[in-house]
Amino acid sequence: MQPIRYRTDLTPYNTFGLHAQARAFIALKHADELRDIVRLPEFDRDTVLWLGGGSNILLMQDYDGLVVHMENKGIREIARSDGMVLIEAQAGEIWHDFVLHTVALGLSGLENLSLIPGTVGASPVQNIGAYGVEAKDVIHSVRCFDLDTETFVTLSNADCRFAYRESLFKQEGKGRYVIVSVVFALKTHFVPNLGYGDLAAKVAELSAGREATAKDVSDAVSAIRNSKLPDPKVLGNVGSFFKNPVVSAEKAATLLQRHPDMPRYPQPDGSVKLAAGWLIDQCRLKGFQIGGAAVHDKQALVLVNKNNASANDVRQLAQHIKFTVFARFQVELHAEPNWLPTSFSL
């Protein structure tokens, strides 16, 4: 087990680059270390922060508790049959590196999720998604450490109760399950999913007349994301700041009467998903800035740390966007990242 560090600067551990310190900090290198970590005097189940890539958190103040940084690594094939491969990745693996690894192995299923920041362990929590694919579509099972019983358990896809940007790990299982690895069910035969946005055109450009591959899709997604989204290493951000709101069919119809060009995505249950970035853009908020926090000038869905932003700058900017969008469309936006502590949530 790694030594505990005290008063640790968390700026390098959150992609928005907010300044905060942890009262205590420890790096986890192997899942088995959890049995020892939960017995540390600094460990408090109610306050411990399990930290991955820090790409989905907003540190609003110093963290008065133990931070466990998940650094366990490893990828292995578990089984292969009937055109399907089960492959397990440890929670500390960098997500995009893992996606590229599976593509290089000739496996299909994760290519649409290329370049999403964060670690493998975060993928089930948020049920990450992009370009028509969600993590739930490819997750077979999730291996966790159950803090109730202090044993390792395996949860099936159904056990995880996935929904849009939701899962068991954000609801009833929050504070109980520590994700240590994820098993993905991937295909050996490439079946492209190109029905979202301008992905098909970019893939056609890259494949140049030949039959497209999973690598073409991964490269296309990466190129599109790089053209629209800032690199958090250069300009701090947490990716998409707001969830795409889901409204009733009646509400969507009313909005369409006033905004016939409004992007909308009908859902299986009859509701309609709207594009949060389009709503924000219609309010002419690109480039809008409060203190050091700003709406990105190319992608309205992304808030950036433009100039040493404070936590209060970020909160005020997010509030302004929520109020402005609601005033114009009567649609409520909800933030994707987790506010820490949660009392700061909008």
Swiss-Prot record:
Q: Which GO terms describe its molecular function?
A: FAD binding; UDP-N-acetylmuramate dehydrogenase activity
Q: What class of enzyme is it?
A: oxidoreductase
Q: What is its main location?
A: cytoplasm
Q: Name one GO cellular component term.
A: cytosol
Q: Which residues form the active site?
A: 165, 240, 336
Give the UniProt keywords, A-Z: Cell cycle, Cell division, Cell shape, Cell wall biogenesis/degradation, Cytoplasm, FAD, Flavoprotein, NADP, Oxidoreductase, Peptidoglycan synthesis
Q: Which GO terms describe its biological process?
A: cell division; cell wall organization; peptidoglycan biosynthetic process; regulation of cell shape
Q: What's the family?
A: Belongs to the MurB family.
- Listed name of the protein: UDP-N-acetylenolpyruvoylglucosamine reductase
Q: Which organism is it from?
A: Neisseria gonorrhoeae (strain ATCC 700825 / FA 1090)
Lineage of the organism: Bacteria, Pseudomonadati, Pseudomonadota, Betaproteobacteria, Neisseriales
